[in-house]
From Swiss-Prot:
InterPro entries: Ribosomal_uL15 (IPR030878), Ribosomal_uL15/eL18 (IPR021131), Ribosomal_uL15/eL18_sf (IPR036227), Ribosomal_uL15_bac-type (IPR005749), Ribosomal_uL15_CS (IPR001196). Binds to the 23S rRNA. This is Large ribosomal subunit protein uL15. GO terms for biological process: translation. The keyword Ligase does not apply. It comes from Bacteroides fragilis (strain ATCC 25285 / DSM 2151 / CCUG 4856 / JCM 11019 / LMG 10263 / NCTC 9343 / Onslow / VPI 2553 / EN-2). GO terms for cellular component: cytosolic large ribosomal subunit. Residues 21-31 have a biased composition (Gly residues). Keywords: Ribonucleoprotein, Ribosomal protein, RNA-binding, rRNA-binding.
Length: 148
C-alpha cells in the first residue's frame, strides 16, 4: 500500500447530482424544479416569514412591552469587589475613576453600589447610586457615602 494507490472505502462516496446538463444525464429538462411557475425560475425567493397565505406568526402573536426612553442604566458593583480593590491598592477613597482603571466599567457608564459581600475597610465610596444595604454596610464600617 502506497500513497499513490489509496482509495476511499467502497460505497463511502457518492457522485454529486449534476443537474441541467441535457436530457441524456437524466437530470436535464426541468432540472428537478418541476414545471413552470415562480419557483422554477432563477432568482426566486419567498418573503421571510411567508406561510403560504396563512396569517404569519409575527402577526398572530400580540405586541407587548416598550422601551422606556427615560431609563437610567447602572453598572452594578458589589461591596466585596470594593473591598478587594481597596485591599489591593491600599485606598481610603474609592471612586468612579478607580473602577475605570480596574476595568470594571467604561468611562461612559454609571455605577450603582450593591450590598453583596462584607466591607471591613473604612472607605469613602463615590458612586452614582447606592442600595440601602450598601449604604448601611459602608457606614457600619466607619466609611461614608458620596453620591455623584
Amino acid at each position: 500500500m502506497n500513497l499513490s494507490n489509496l482509495k476511499p472505502a467502497e460505497g463511502s462516496t457518492k457522485t454529486r447530482k449534476r443537474i441541467g446538463r441535457g436530457p441524456g444525464s437524466g437530470l436535464g429538462g426541468t432540472s428537478t424544479r418541476g414545471h413552470k411557475g415562480a419557483k422554477s425560475r432563477s432568482g426566486y425567493s419567498k418573503k421571510i416569514g411567508f406561510e403560504g397565505g396563512q396569517m404569519p406568526l409575527q402577526r398572530r402573536v400580540p405586541k407587548f412591552g416598550f422601551k422606556n426612553i427615560n431609563r437610567i442604566e447602572y453598572k452594578a458593583i458589589n461591596l466585596e469587589t470594593i473591598q478587594k480593590l481597596a485591599e489591593a491598592k491600599k485606598l481610603e477613597k474609592v471612586g468612579v475613576n478607580d473602577f475605570i482603571e480596574a476595568g470594571f466599567i467604561s468611562s461612559s457608564q454609571l455605577v450603582k453600589v450593591l450590598g453583596n459581600g462584607t466591607l471591613t475597610a473604612k472607605l469613602s465610596v463615590e458612586a452614582h447610586a447606592f442600595s440601602k444595604s450598601a449604604v448601611a454596610a459602608i457606614e457600619a464600617a466607619g466609611g461614608n457615602v458620596v453620591k455623584l
